[in-house]
Amino acid sequence: MSVEIPQQDVMIVTGMSGAGRSTVGNALEDLGWYVVDNLPPQMLKPLVELAGRAGTSLPKIAAVVDVRGGDFFSELRDILQTFGTGPRLRVLFLEATDAALVRRFEQVRRPHPLQGNGTLLDGIAAERARMIEIREASDLVIDTSELNIHQLATTITEQFSGADDAGVRVTVMSFGFKYGTPADADMVADMRFLPNPFWTPELRPLTGRDKAVSDYVLGQEGAEEFVHAYARALAPVLAGYQRENKRHATIAIGCTGGKHRSVAVSEELSSLLRALPGVAVSTKHRDLGRE
């Protein structure tokens, strides 16, 4: 049976070791959240009960949890069943590629917590396997592979600062397929059906943020039609996210290198999505400047 309790925000921050949980906790604390670091999974339910207690003066509580320490998924499921109409309970999952995690562990010269007598990659693989269920149940997944601590803190600030009544925070992210598809994307669109400005000498050094490139890309046959049709298709999706209390969405727009077509289309799509009710939009260009 669900228990009716006040609407405090409760954020559970978890994910891969080395993916940036402590950085996220610090960033949330800077935004005014009350942050509990290294909370044992068994303490989650008492924390949520505290958030719902009458007179609680902590409107935003974040718990940084290491899910390796217990049966976290069953604990979370029990919380959702008990407090189904209670706090705005969200799960933020941080992940990174094996290469990024190996690099970070080698920089600090520490073994992975699950490494045992095996290799560093063995420990990462074991942890990733344990994380499958909780990743799938998370409200927001952030891939930190290409982010330093300052960029990750900025990402958290963009996602969790500002008006609390924004129904869905949408990140429109351009990227280059040659650098890999964003692991944290909810939806991916491929702009390689459009002619590449790279092959036009005067446009090659420019980016999709420049008017000449934007006009070129959006002036191609089917470009404007696609962007407007995609925005119309996303409208009921984002409205459904609001009804289901899914408060974050990442829409990835790709081209070959992430410099021209995907950037121009991301900017145009963002401007259209900003007209939707209950939607707060930010635009990121993941691979701009990598060429």
Curated annotation (Swiss-Prot):
ATP binds at G15, M16, S17, G18, A19, G20, R21, S22. Pfam families: PapZ_C, RapZ-like_N. GO terms for molecular function: ATP binding; GTP binding. GTP binds at D66, V67, R68, G69. Gene3D superfamilies: P-loop containing nucleotide triphosphate hydrolases (3.40.50.300). Keywords: ATP-binding, GTP-binding, Nucleotide-binding. NCBIfam families: PRK05416.1 (NF003828). Displays ATPase and GTPase activities. Belongs to the RapZ-like family. HAMAP family: RapZ_like. This is Nucleotide-binding protein CMM_1747.
